[in-house]
């Protein structure tokens, strides 16, 4: 029965997405769950697969998120009407009783919490969030999806005829490496796209186009990253996004902090995936040289 219900939910998602007039009706009691993971943008992208997985087990799921991240999340799940959000303040602290009370008062059937248990260890990021819930690692790969937004297509169309690279060097800990080091290694006719900052002077040929590509939502850069000749990123939300994208080229680099205890470049060796549907790429370590 449970698998039949899941198949129905998946068919409903497809029908909703294509706006089909053929709507199958089911007579079972509707269920809903609330999901709480870590609340950074990168954490939400990491947990995209588990959220979409649980959205096939329940008729609707609600994801805890900070107010400042709501817009990004709405875009991550724009294609699925069964996924909604409960906003909390930036200083939110997980208190089990409060979450359980909220769930009970709002008639949720289940509370799904990952990453808020005191004894949790995070050596196996990002897969530990799935292990905490006893989910197989392939849920991370196979259920991940962020739709291609019109804005993503618009931004990519504006630079698709340029020779360009994508660089993101900032995370919650600040600036991780100097973009100027990359400028020294590339042809002057190569456009450097950074989502947070325009590195060109106002009289430079690339200033205007680089300016139009700054400060957009994370999902808006999907096609730009997928088609970049070179990607160079630090351990940030953009890296969390990029490892599950269909990158066109092989030169994709990750800057690893010196005290990091988890080598993300070996993810694909330890946690294999089926690459027949999405051509994911391995990452190389960036050591100020591309």
Residue spans of the language-model regions?
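Anionic, Ser/Thr-rich low-complexity intrinsically disordered regions
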Residues: 1-30
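Catalytic machinery of carbohydrate-active enzymes
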Residues: 31-290
């Amino acid at each position: 029965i449970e698998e039949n219900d899941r198949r129905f939910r998946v068919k409903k998602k497809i029908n909703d997405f294509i706006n089909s007039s053929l709507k199958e009706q089911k007579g079972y009691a509707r269920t809903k769950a609330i999901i709480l993971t870590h609340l950074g943008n990168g954490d939400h992208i990491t947990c995209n697969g588990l959220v979409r997985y649980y959205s096939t087990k329940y008729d609707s799921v609600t994801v805890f998120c900070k107010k400042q991240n709501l817009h990004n999340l709405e875009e991550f799940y724009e294609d699925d009407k069964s996924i909604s959000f409960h906003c909390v303040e930036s200083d939110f602290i997980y208190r089990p009783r409060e979450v359980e009370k909220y769930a009970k008062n709002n008639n949720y059937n289940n509370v799904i919490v990952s990453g808020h248990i005191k004894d949790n260890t995070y050596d196996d990021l990002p897969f530990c969030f799935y292990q905490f819930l006893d989910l197989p690692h392939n849920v991370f790969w196979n259920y991940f999806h962020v739709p291609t937004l019109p804005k993503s297509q618009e931004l990519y169309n504006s630079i698709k005829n340029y020779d360009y690279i994508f660089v993101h060097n900032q995370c919650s800990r600040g600036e991780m490496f100097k973009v100027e080091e990359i400028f020294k290694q590339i042809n002057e006719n190569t456009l450097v796209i950074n989502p947070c900052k325009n590195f060109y002077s106002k009289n430079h040929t690339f200033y205007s186009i680089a300016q139009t590509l700054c400060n957009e939502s994370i999902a808006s850069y999907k096609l730009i990253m997928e088609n970049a000749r070179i990607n160079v990123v630090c351990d940030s939300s953009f890296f969390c996004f990029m490892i599950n994208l269909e990158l066109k080229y092989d030169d994709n680099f990750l800057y690893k902090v010196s005290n990091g205890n988890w080598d993300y470049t070996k993810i694909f060796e330890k946690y294999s995936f089926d690459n027949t549907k999405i051509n994911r790429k391995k990452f190389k370590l960036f050591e100020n040289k591309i």
